[in-house]
């Protein structure tokens, strides 16, 4: 019993230690825009995203700022919060990132936790990969915050940046799962050794259709799940495609630089348990019916044979009748013989012939 309580206390301490530590992986800054991942998974809510950017002396970027950063090389393979949207900036098509689309890919989903994207107005206008060594707007707290830069350098600080009590003590312990096509930041070549993100430039083959194309047009075909598609426009007049999270089926679309087609894994329909149980019961009933039918056939199949012999009775009965000139009375002898009896029909025929011969001899003697 003491061992159980000791292990429980040790496990509780480990849980508290894990909850008291936060790792923040950040990318380079592109026109002030950078991506932040918390604890290696989607675990940042919308309110925490704003607090985290504020701790970095930054804000959530707008769509125009995202487009400007993408134009100079900013792209990721994970969803992140911006002002009013959840997006992935893509420059090169990749089948596991943003459904093989390019541009600022907007997601519409019910999932509430993602990464975040921040914008620092004081950052250089181009690409800046210098290490971040401070969390200037973090206040005092018991949490150990570690900033992991793209080059592997780390900066650790005690403090807190979250202001929403639900973010500090979430009611749901398990983190929300990301969409199927963005389970990680990409292949190992697309991630840095420190756990952050590297900007990758992977050129995939692009198919150019012969028919005219509309920019950023999407259509759903052969879908197995319901998806919501729409479009939004920013004040500058640009049009962005909005997609729902795709978990199965196929989608295809054409873009400004070509058409890209992505295919998701087809999900096999799940067989209900009640249907399996019903099929098992029916099979069992069929087997029992066959057994009962075979047993009944064996019982009813024991046929009985009637062997009828015409005889005239015993010797004593036949003598007076023969002397008096009366007609001999015939007597029928009926033998019931089972099909499985040890005596064969030939034996019965032999006995009958013997009796008939005796009758004939007696008549001749009289």
From Swiss-Prot:
Membrane topology per the entry is: Single-pass type I membrane protein
Residues on the membrane's Extracellular side span: 21-273
Q: Which domain of life is it from?
A: Eukaryota
Region annotation (Stem) maps to: 229-273
Membrane-spanning residues:
274-294
Give the Phosphoserine positions (modified residues).
296, 321, 330
Where are stretches of biased composition, namely Basic and acidic residues? 156-165, 222-231
Q: Which residues form the signal peptide?
A: 1-20
What residues does hyaluronan bind to? 41, 78-79, 105
Cysteines engaged in disulfide bonds, as pairs? 28-129, 53-118, 77-97
Free-text note regarding domains: The lectin-like LINK domain is responsible for hyaluronan binding.
Q: What is the stated purpose of this protein?
A: Cell-surface receptor that plays a role in cell-cell interactions, cell adhesion and migration, helping them to sense and respond to changes in the tissue microenvironment. Participates thereby in a wide variety of cellular functions including the activation, recirculation and homing of T-lymphocytes, hematopoiesis, inflammation and response to bacterial infection.
Stated name of the protein: CD44 antigen
Q: Which organism is it from?
A: Bos taurus (Bovine)
The gene name reads CD44
